[in-house]
Amino acid sequence: MSKLRTEDMSHPVKPLRSFLIQDILSHMGPGSKEKSLGFPKTDQDQDSSLRDTEEKYASEKLQSSSQPAEIHHSHMEADENLELDTAQPITAVENKLAKQQQKRSRAAFSHSQVIELERKFSSQKYLSAPERAQLAKSLKLTETQVKIWFQNRRYKTKRKQLATDMEEVEKSSAHPAQCRDTNISRTSLLSFYQNYQRYPYLYYLAGWPAPLW
């Protein structure tokens, strides 16, 4: 009897384990309930799994189809940025030209200033830097205004001289033709007079038509 007690005390007593379903499920994860119990999958579970698979496939397909659109959109943004970058220098050039045009606006000279400038130009077509500075100071103008006025005046003089030369060339080219026509008329008249023996007197020439002269 004592021997049995000694053997019982030598083996530790194992705690009792409950075989109730609630106790069993409490020691297991929510995902392994059906697997541990060996319950077969229902139609609802199969439909849910199939639906999840379809949704995953549709999501992957949507992502793959949206990538070209995103790439195209990024290319469009890059092109727009490039256009903006290339348009900026043009705008800068236009602004620069507008400022230059404003600076080149024609200055208004007074009557006395114009008279003095014309008097100086008639005696001297080109001015040195000291002469230009002295003239600008005497007329209360800037050296740039005096320089531009002389440049425009020289251009105007050359253009006027060129027009005069062209008129002279046209006149000189027209005179030989007129002389040649006159010589032809005189030659024709003399030939007609020599061949037409019935009217030998010169006084009859007054009765001929004017174009023959």
UniProtKB/Swiss-Prot annotation:
Primary location class: nucleus
GO biological process, one term: cell differentiation
GO cellular component terms, semicolon-separated: nucleus
Biased composition (Basic and acidic residues): 32-59
Tissue specificity remark: Expressed in the muscle layer of embryonic somites. In tailbud embryos, expressed throughout the entire myotome but at the mid-tailbud stage (stage 32), expression becomes restricted to the outer periphery of the somite so that by the tadpole stage only the outer, type I cells show expression. Also expressed in the dorsal cement gland and in the myocardial layer of the developing heart. In all tissues, expression begins after terminal differentiation.
Protein induction: By ihh/bhh.
Family the UniProt entry places it in: Belongs to the NK-3 homeobox family.
Protein name in UniProt: Homeobox protein koza
